[in-house]
Structures are given as structure tokens and as C-alpha cells.
Amino acid sequence: MKHPPCSVVAAATAILAVVLAIGGCSTEGDAGKASDTAATASNGDAAMLLKQATDAMRKVTGMHVRLAVTGDVPNLRVTKLEGDISNTPQTVATGSATLLVGNKSEDAKFVYVDGHLYSDLGQPGTYTDFGNGTSIYNVSVLLDPNKGLANLLANLKDASVAGSQQADGVATTKITGNSSADDIATLAGSRLTSEDVKTVPTTVWIASDGSSHLVQIQIAPTKDTSVTLTMSDWGKQVTATKPV
């Protein structure tokens, strides 16, 4: 069987590293500062809301995800992604993505099942087995209570409530703060900042309907860039079969 070009393999790898990878949030512009008085008053509320969101996220075993990237984010070839993922009884993901292959933008569908990533990248309608996904990126990390989105919520620093806002049609409370660059790298599968950067501006939108679900998260890895992950259908069970 003919092996796909290196550029295609790299792009397929990027699908994995984003499928469930980036769940980060908030642009520098979004992380606006409230007055000192308001900030002091909102810190306690932010801590409580983040605790509730962390607990809720740790219980999520499946969901729909939508990724959007603005600007040229270091080490990130995926510019857009939408799909479903669940980790019970095993990690399964399906969806579509837009990636940079060389200097060209290409659309591809993907299926992650039985520890393998299948994609029609470079060959629309014809799926290639890109091997054991866990050897490239541990796709279950997004829902991992200790390394994934729950960990990011639990360790958000300098958190402050920035008001109420509709996110993806859901009423939410917006919270701004900073995430560890190392935590972002763990979640993304690669470092999105230079080695000397310690924190990444992060914004989260938490559902205010009592569920405390994380609706959206955005990070600003470098100047004029952002990575936004929007979630819905929490608890969704995803099934998939190996593409023929």
C-alpha cells in the first residue's frame, strides 16, 4: 500500500492533536480588566463558579466540540474542527476538520475508533489508517479529569468574573484568568507558546442554568492569535465503526 506524503501525515497528526486537544480559551482582548473594586468583589464568585464547573466537567463522558483558530498559532495546523467525542466505554471521535497541508488549506473527515485514526485527508472519500492514535496524541486527554479541561478549570489563576454573556446561544457567566502554559501544552499535545512563556490568557464561559457546564473556552497563545473551543451535548454517547 502506498504511504501518504509526510505533509499529509503531519496534518493528520494535527487532527488528533486538536480533536480533543485544544480546549483553551480567551483572547488577550477579551481578558479586559474590571475596576479594582468590582474585581475584588468578583474573585470569590469566580472561584465558586470554577469549582462548580470543574466538578461538572469531571463527570462529562461525551460531548460535541467545535474548534476555531484565529491567526497563526505555533505548532497548530488545524484551523477549524467540528466533531463528537466520548470516552466511555472507550475513546471514540468522529468529525471534520480544515488543516494546513504545506501552504494549502484542505478539508478532511476523520474517525477515531479502536485506538486508530482514520481520515480521508488528501483523498476525499477514501480513508487511510494513520495508525495508533495514542502513539501520536492521547485523544482521551480532553475529558481526562486530571489533565484535560477539568484540570484547566481547576487551575485557572487570577480568575475574575467579567459579566454575563450569551455563548453559542446559552446564557453564561464569563470568567477571565490565566492558565499554565504547561497545562495548555499537555491538553494540546504540543507547546503553543515559546518556552519562556509561563502563562496563557484564558477566558471561560460557564452555563448559568444550574448545570455549570463549560460552554466555551478560549486561549490567546501569542499576540493576535486565539484558539476557541465550544462545547454542547454534554453526556453524548458517540459510536463509530472502522471506515471501509
Curated annotation (Swiss-Prot):
Lipid attachment residues per UniProt (N-palmitoyl cysteine): 25
Location of the protein in the cell: Cell membrane
Matches recorded under CDD domains: LppX-like
GO annotations of cellular component type: plasma membrane
Lipid-modified residues, S-diacylglycerol cysteine kind: 25
SUPFAM superfamilies: Prokaryotic lipoproteins and lipoprotein localization factors
Cysteine pairings via disulfide bonds: none
Principal subcellular localization: membrane
Signal peptide limits: 1-24
Keywords: Cell membrane, Lipoprotein, Membrane, Palmitate, Signal
Membrane topology: Lipid-anchor
Alphabetized Gene3D superfamilies for the sequence: 2.50.20.20
Family, similarity comment: Belongs to the LppX/LprAFG lipoprotein family.
This protein's name: Putative lipoprotein LprA
Organism: Mycobacterium bovis (strain ATCC BAA-935 / AF2122/97)
